[in-house]
Swiss-Prot record:
Binds 2 iron ions per subunit. It holds the Pfam family Ribonuc_red_sm. GO terms for molecular function: metal ion binding; ribonucleoside-diphosphate reductase activity, thioredoxin disulfide as acceptor. Fe cation 1 binds at D99, E130, H133. The keyword Metal-binding applies. It comes from Plasmodium falciparum (isolate Dd2). The active site is at Y137. The gene is RNR2. Provides the precursors necessary for DNA synthesis. Catalyzes the biosynthesis of deoxyribonucleotides from the corresponding ribonucleotides. Heterodimer of a large and a small subunit. It catalyses: a 2'-deoxyribonucleoside 5'-diphosphate + [thioredoxin]-disulfide + H2O = a ribonucleoside 5'-diphosphate + [thioredoxin]-dithiol. The keyword Cytoplasm does not apply. This is Ribonucleoside-diphosphate reductase small chain.
């Protein structure tokens, strides 16, 4: 197995980058969406309909960990070879750890900083959703791993597993007040849109093989949620008056691509489960280009999607994906227009 790529390959923050962040933060003092709305204590009238629409999509997609059927997963897991088991364990360990980082970013930063009432509703709901993701990954680890020592090692993956630590460090370095809001919202979009992409794709590979139904169904729901969260980051960024130079955004995205590529193609190579690492690298680039376009930037990789079976999942920024009943799963009536919600007595039974 390849050596773990050390996070030192990713530059932390140079003096020039620090100076740019300070300059950008100075510009953000007068950002409308970061300044408190005077005396707005009620939701209506909706002032940001696009932001509110994202909240309603999230609400329509709500699910709980108890609804994931894991009854046949353990039998499937025990039939996997050792490489496949190793891969699944470490991917789940990363997911379980990363949700804690995302939650910290939401609770201590974005929910407090963004002053749009509609956005606060979304962030509050996202915190609940991320809690469900975290619970689901913990349940999966608990279900698959019966050795208590190994299970605890996976639950503390950031400290114990270098491949996971490297990804977590890159994500965690953006949870601070030293960088501008614009940089942090872009980096957060990269965490949810790029740093999860290879692992989501790999689990969908198991779905193609009709294995691990509980894991793959939860992956479908969670990847859908994270796709919406990624697009929401892009929407919030689009509302900023003081946007970043395109080169800065591209640099952040390229860093995220390098981190994800080193994780899923080198440190924990997807070859372990029979996937092609070269094609996986191309897929990560494809996802990154879609994110760049969502952020209003030009593509830098110009890579095509090598996995046509991934076309319909949420990582590619298709927010209309949420208007479909993914896996027949959407709260009834939540996305319906109020004018269409009519009570009638003339239906034939």
């Amino acid at each position: 197995m390849a050596d773990v790529i050390n996070i030192s390959r990713i530059p932390i923050f140079s003096k020039q980058e620090r100076e740019f962040s300070d300059l950008q933060k100075g510009k953000e003092i007068n950002e409308k969406i970061l300044n408190k709305e005077s005396d707005r204590f009620t939701l209506y009238p909706i002032l940001y309909p696009d932001v509110w629409d994202f909240y309603k999509k999230a609400e329509a997609s709500f699910w709980t960990a108890e609804e994931i059927d894991l009854s046949s997963d353990l039998k499937d897991f025990e039939k996997l070879n050792e490489n496949e088991k190793h891969f699944i364990k470490h991917v789940l360990a990363f997911f379980a750890a990363s949700d804690g980082i995302v939650l910290e970013n939401l609770a201590s930063k974005f929910l407090r900083e963004v002053q749009i009432t509609e956005a606060k509703k979304f962030y509050s709901f996202q915190i609940a959703v991320e809690n469900i993701h975290s619970e689901t990954y913990s349940l999966l680890i608990d279900n698959y791993i019966k050795d208590e020592k190994e299970r605890l090692n996976l639950f503390h993956a950031i400290e114990n597993i270098p491949a996971v630590k490297n990804k977590a460090l890159w994500a965690a370095k953006w949870i601070n007040d030293t960088n501008s809001f614009a940089e942090r919202i872009v980096a957060n979009a990269c965490v949810e849109g790029i740093l999860f992409s290879g692992s989501f794709c790999a689990i969908f590979w198991f779905k193609k093989q009709n294995k691990l139904h509980g894991l793959t169904f939860s992956n479908e729901l969670i990847s859908r949620d994270e796709g919406l969260h990624t697009d929401f980051n892009c929407l919030i960024y689009s509302l900023l008056d003081n946007k970043l130079p395109e080169q800065i955004i591209q640099n952040i995205v390229k860093e995220a691509v390098e981190v994800e590529r080193s994780f899923i193609c080198e440190s924990l190579p997807c070859d372990l489960i029979g996937m092609n690492s070269r094609l996986m690298s191309q897929y990560i680039e494809f996802v990154a280009d879609r994110l760049l376009e969502c952020l209003g930037c030009s593509k830098i990789f110009h890579s095509k999607n090598p996995f046509n079976w991934m076309d319909l999942i949420s990582l590619q920024g298709k927010t209309n994906f949420f208007e479909k009943r993914v896996a027949d799963y959407q709260k009834s009536g939540v996305m319906a227009q109020r004018k269409d919600q009519v009570f009638c007595l003339n239906t034939e039974f």
